[in-house]
Amino acid sequence: MLRNSIAPSRGLGSLARQRLTTSGRNLITKRSYVKGKSAAWPPGRSIASVLPARKTSCATFTTSATRGNEQNIRSPPSPSSASAISPEGISKPASSSPAGQTSPGSSVNSPEPPKAQTSAPPPPPPPPPPAPKAKGRFGRSLLYLVLTAGVAYAGGVWFSLRSDNFHDFFTEYVPYGEEAVLYFEELDFRRRFPNATRHINTRPAAPRDEGEKVTIPSKSGVSWKVAENEGTSDVTHKGRHMSAVDAEVPRTGGDAKSAPNKPTTEDKKDSEKTGSKKDESKERVPVTDTKKSTVSLDEPRKPAVATVASIEPLASLQDDPIIQELTKIVNGLIAVINADESASKLAAPIAKAKDDFLKLGEQISSIKKEAHAAAQEEIKNAHKEFERSATELVRRIDEVRSEEAAEYREEFETEREKLANSYQEKIKTEVERANAVAEQRLRNELVEQAIELNRKFLSDVDTLVEKERQGRFSKLSELSAQVAELEKLTAGWNEVIGANLTTQQLQVAVDAVHSALESESMPRPFINELLAVKSLAGQDPIVNAAISSINPTAYQRGIPSTAQIIDRFRRVANEVRKASLLPEDAGVASHATSYLMSKVMFKKEASSSGDDVESILTRTEKLLEQGNLDDAAREMNALRGWSKLLSKDWLADVRRVLEVRQALEVCFLSLLPTLSLLIYYNEC
């Protein structure tokens, strides 16, 4: 009987758990696109896991028909309840000793090394370990058998609480199986419904009339079928199953006016909500007697059986077919209980179960709303995250574009420098070729001139020879002298031609150095030009000494032009004016005072007698404008203190320029003897 009362609770729990799991899966499916980022509903977790355990008594009592309908479906007692048997209750088999070890281990100390200069005898060897006691195989096998049987028996009891088919097999064929299963079911029932047994024990037993015989027809009672129509039964339709009062019971007084099968107000409301469908199936109603009995009006009327109204469909879950099906099943149970004579005993538990069922529906509705709100919130968060990611992506794209633009700009500058260098090399090559062509042309002209002179000489010789012949070899000595003179003249002309070529080449090299110094806007090295001058000068000591006197920094880094020197002097002059009033041991206050006083000082005109800083700067600027760098450097060298310290770099640059110019002038002056010789020979 206790098992029959627990079975419907398992059926209701199975349907409720199936409904909650389906709702949880639907919600998880709707939010699958934020599955990786959302931690609110992780995969594999259903809404049933967050529902609190509820103590319900709506499924405590049922009939054998409901159990027969769900004989192949057995579920845990409730969605939140665990197994009645804890894993700690199962004993573990004792661990056996290793098979390879037949004796207990013994510890033997390692022998110590022999000590020097000792005559003590070695210690005696340790005694052998005692032989192990033989263990009985029979006792071990019996222990394993007992443990295995206990584990199998406990597992059978646990699985019987989960499966109906195994429950029937276990209780029928295993000794004491039914008592063990009923014991654990009763424990589980008392744990879930602690007040149920107390109410049953305290309720007074109804007097039973066992004197009369009650005959039950063959087709009376509750059938396992809820409805015999094509579809499922709907408890919201009007019919005989909506009333537990027999239609054949006579009424007296005011109760006789109303028909026994007239639907109640709740039935009318239910029928208005679900529509006016006609019930095409015939419900089997329990009948205690097929014949109508006549009752006199003087007989006292039996008290009316208190019935429980059916559950109205939940308005918030009308679109959920599983909840509606569960409502129909519960209403069917209520109708069956109302049709029983002992319905008054079950009215309070059924009413409480009805209230719990309605609360469960409201809780499911609230959980669905919360899940929907959480899903909407996660969708908004996902949109915000997407917008943030898009903004970050745009920012990264802009950064990449700016980096690429910088790289392209750098490549452009590099290519431009390469093109400029290549054009400079081309120009240099063209100049060298033009110089080579000019030199070759000059050489050709000199050769032609020499040939012409030789031709003229030969013609003169022929003429003289003819005259001599005509004069019968007169003046032969004079002719020989003239020939010797002509030979000397020819040799001199050859020397003049070689010197002329060397002089021209050296002059071109010196001019190239001058052009390299004056044509560039920025100082550049002129090592190649100096090497050309030195190679053309050969062993000339004057040119070699002049080139050696040049500072290597000058031809390695280049020297500034006159315009650059003047421009830099103006900047240096401003700084010198600011520090003109400073003594040699000036501090921070002196520097600040000198800086302020330099703002109000007037620029003086050039004075030949002034020794102050402003006069020196003015004279130096005038000399620089006239191109006299030597005197300008002498004037700036006359400064003292901070002024001279500030102009130190400028003086160094001017000295390098003067050294280079002086060396070039020396190289040019070395060409003067050759030029004078050329002029002399030309005059001759």
From Swiss-Prot:
InterPro entries: MIC60
Membrane-related topology note: Single-pass membrane protein
Mitochondrial intermembrane side: 162-684
Pfam families, alphabetized: Mitofilin (PF09731)
Intervals, Mitochondrial matrix compartment: 12-140
Principal place of residence: mitochondrion
One biological process term in Gene Ontology: cristae formation
GO cellular component, one term: MICOS complex
Keywords: Coiled coil, Membrane, Mitochondrion, Mitochondrion inner membrane, Transit peptide, Transmembrane, Transmembrane helix
Region (Disordered): 61-135, 200-301
Transmembrane segments: 141-161
Cellular localization per UniProt: Mitochondrion inner membrane
Coiled coil ranges: 367-445
Polar residues biased stretches: 61-74, 93-110
Annotated organelle transit peptide span: 1-11
Lineage: superkingdom: Eukaryota
Chain intervals with Pro residues compositional bias: 120-132
Biased composition (Basic and acidic residues): 264-301
Family, as annotated: Belongs to the MICOS complex subunit Mic60 family.
Assembly and binders: Component of the mitochondrial contact site and cristae organizing system (MICOS) complex.
Task of the protein: Component of the MICOS complex, a large protein complex of the mitochondrial inner membrane that plays crucial roles in the maintenance of crista junctions, inner membrane architecture, and formation of contact sites to the outer membrane. Plays a role in keeping cristae membranes connected to the inner boundary membrane. Also promotes protein import via the mitochondrial intermembrane space assembly (MIA) pathway.
Protein name: MICOS complex subunit MIC60
Organism per entry: Arthroderma benhamiae (strain ATCC MYA-4681 / CBS 112371) (Trichophyton mentagrophytes)
